[in-house]
Amino acid sequence: MRVPGIPDEEFIREEKIPMTKEEIRVLALSKARLFYGAKFLDVGSGTGSVSVEAGLIVGEKGKVYAVERDPQAVELTRKNVEKFSLRNVEIIEGEAPEVLNKINDELDSAFIGGTERLEEIIPVVSEKIRRGGMIVLDAILIESAVKALHTLSELGYKAEVIEVIVAKGMKTSKGYAMISRNPIFIIYGEKK
């Protein structure tokens, strides 16, 4: 079984396309409760880092749908999917929630990485999630976290939130200094 935690440096990157960092991916995917054979949706795939990690976890019997509206990010997701030799990731170019109608599978879990239009995207994603499935989101802004919590709660999810502050060690001439990254909210809930 594959566990998440691919080092960030292993992904092909482009300066203006955001990437969910390694430690946040690990926590978010654990909250998604992925398993071999699962069907998973990544809304706002960016670099494709979450889609790649998920694709490795769900394996050849599983399926990952990577949704992205930015053509450059779509291409970057494609490059990373190819780099990791994944055949179980389907990339869907377009705006969520509109393009989500292209997904006919019942999903086990979903990750929403973009924070625009949450009140529109979350209900459409929820319709595709099986009972007992998970929706996970990450957000930098408190307002986005509150919108996500409120929307999940309105849909009957037991919504929860954690704030994650990661500091990575950087070697200096005298030892290691801890360099802090941006705090991130991870919001998640199980469909009842």
UniProtKB/Swiss-Prot annotation:
KW Transferase (keyword) present: yes
InterPro entries: CbiT (IPR023475), Cbl_synth_MTase_CbiT (IPR014008), Cobalamin_biosynth_MTase (IPR050714), Methyltranfer_dom (IPR025714), SAM-dependent_MTases_sf (IPR029063)
Alphabetized UniProt keyword annotations: Cobalamin biosynthesis, Methyltransferase, S-adenosyl-L-methionine, Transferase
Binding positions for S-adenosyl-L-methionine per the UniProt entry: 20, 44-48, 68, 96
Entry's EC annotation: 2.1.1.196
Cross-referenced CDD domains: AdoMet_MTases (cd02440)
Gene: cbiT
Record bears the keyword Methyltransferase: yes
Example of a GO biological process term: anaerobic cobalamin biosynthetic process
Cystine connections: none
Pathway entry: Cofactor biosynthesis; adenosylcobalamin biosynthesis; cob(II)yrinate a,c-diamide from sirohydrochlorin (anaerobic route): step 8/10
Family classification: Belongs to the methyltransferase superfamily. Archaeal-type CbiT family.
Catalytic activity line of the entry: Co-precorrin-6B + S-adenosyl-L-methionine = Co-precorrin-7 + S-adenosyl-L-homocysteine + CO2
Name of the featured protein: Probable cobalt-precorrin-6B C(15)-methyltransferase (decarboxylating)
GO MF terms held by the record: cobalt-precorrin-6B C5-methyltransferase activity; protein methyltransferase activity
Any single Pfam family the record assigns to this protein: Methyltransf_31
Species the sequence originates in: Sulfolobus acidocaldarius (strain ATCC 33909 / DSM 639 / JCM 8929 / NBRC 15157 / NCIMB 11770)
